[in-house]
Amino acid sequence: MKVGITGHRNQRLGLPEDETDEKWTPIQFWIIDELSKFIKTCSDNNEPLDLYTGMASGSDIAFAIAGVSMHYIDSIKLHCILPCKDYNSSHKYYKFLKLKATEWVELSDKFYKGCDNVRDQYIVDKCDVLLAIWDGNKSGGVWYTIRKAQKAGKRIIYCPKELLINK
């Protein structure tokens, strides 16, 4: 099974830059709960669980960290799909996730306008299921990725909106 992520950056969610901060806990628990369901299905079907992240700050990194935290399950494979070389390379967890990744794909040598959209389409094309950490606003990259997944007939699982309210 192949699971992708689309979700907002920490600023839009009103959350700290560090995705391991306790304020991220409700979202991290939701991700882990969803991944646990997929692990069961994959185990029953004797297949790997492939996780696809775009490596943007916020939801993408939180998803990758959750996947890596389940390292005791050998069948989990982390695929980091970057729109361009060195994308988000100053992020606190960049080097750690690069070391843990099964696959590290840089879709372009340089950043260009629209390269994020190419990365998002790559993830939609690869995944069977898309987890969406979305605030409900029909604008921006997360919304466009959801629309791409809908048009492609992908299963989409939405993070409950009550978890997105920064308390």
What are the functions of these language-model segments?
Residues 1-166:
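Acidic/glycine-enriched connector segments
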